[in-house]
Amino acid sequence: DEECWSLYDVRYVVTQREHASRVYHSILRRSKAAADVVRRGFLTCLPEKETRLYALIKKLYDEGGDFLRNTADPVYYPVAKALRHMSGELEKLRGFVRFSDYSGVLGAEIEPKNRVLPLLRRHFCDRYANESFFIYDRTHKELLVYTKNHSRLLTVDSLHLALPGEEEVQFRRLWKRFYETIAIKERYNPRCQNTFMPKRYRCTMTEFLPDDYEARQQGVNLPAASEASPVPGAPAGISAPATPPRSGPSAPGSDL
């Protein structure tokens, strides 16, 4: 290990789970809302959150939990603001997580500012109860794994995704074609798009990634998939990627 230089003494505090459990339950007895604020507050990206949460807990012991009703309270306000930010990120990630098929296992990556995987865990485990999947948090090096009604959160330094199969690449192209053609050109509004789909989420979204981005990360060249071939099992009404859609009959009563 490299030697670290500091003007201050460094003190390592070993976690005492029994002691921590007693403190948490004492907070819970005073205010269930405060216990939830503390638990979720540790998952936020609030700078110096430990110090701010300590001040909040101290005020809870000294004055009770009534101050939590006032979001303008100088002790509670920064924590409440961080919790709102995390809630907004959670709401977006419930819709922005993009899974790919890796040999029968669904996999996705995210880059959140807050440590959201513990809070997303139940949502995705319920939603994909019959699947096996994983979600990797690049920011916090955390991996959520689910299979056969069991889920685990693991600490993983890095994750190298397997190369996608031809069918997966074709489905990605279909999804991109849908994304590109569903928009109304005359109503294109990048400012509105950036509001509802912020750019920082797009680095892990299929719509904005090359089909073979895993291979590019590993320096592997994949053979080009045939753009004219349809995806196995895809509805006949969906054109193959890069194939212009054919004209169809007009709506009943139309002269077009």
State where each predicted segment sits.
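Extended, well-folded catalytic/binding cores that form a central cleft or groove in large enzyme
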Residues: 1-249, 253-256
